[in-house]
Amino acid sequence: MTETITFQNVLDHLLDSKKEIPQAHLKLYSDLDPKSLRLFMDVWPSVKPVRKLLLLNELINHLEVDTLVTYEEIGRALLDDPDGDVRARAILLLAESDDPKLAAKLTNILLNDTDLAPRMEAVNLLGEFILLGELEELPEEIQRKAEDALITVIRSDDNSALRRSALEALGYSSRPEMVTLIESAFERADPAWKASALRAMGRSHDERWNDGVISTLLDEDPRIKFAAVEAAGELNIQEAGSILLKMLEDEEEDDDVIALGRRQRCHLAH
């Protein structure tokens, strides 16, 4: 007879750092009711830091293979955790959320968190909320505040990777400032900035960027080339088809670029 595993059993197991976290336990962290969440938060301070990250990584990975689970309750509860790595992973647990209140929280994290990791994850998820706003599925005021925060970061002297991610996230936005921001990034000598500009172009679904994308499809830098191939597919640039074919015939081409190019060419053909 199989013994029933209670959530208290799961928490007791979590506290024992010598034991591996069984896959069977991961579902029991899903969709916690208020009582279970309180139990979880009561024991959380006693869990060793490495063990905390191990659990959160397991939950994040499990989200990708099991569409029936949700760890939003845990994610929300840990957004204010004192450990920046925990906060970053908490945001990843909220990747499927479309709650407007979360967008406001992410905006605050982006502007005020003291650690880079949660700010990076906040930027990435804010991009999804900007898209919801463009689809009129997010209150206009919340979208505007999120866009303002992203623009502030892009124009700041903050971490370069964070600023580039903010540009990519804002690519979904129809704000008039986007044209200048994308152009400025595209004209930089830094390949990383040019690649981010191309990703923003693709997300904009604005054909004004078609020529810029086509001009970089055969760029020598793989970062730029990969982003250009992505953008060509997202913008549905039919003229890119012949260039992608040439790319696929190049035996020295990067494997990742070839794989993406093959997918995008099939997309353009249909």
Protein language model annotation of sequence segments:
Residues D254-H270:
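Short, compositionally biased segments
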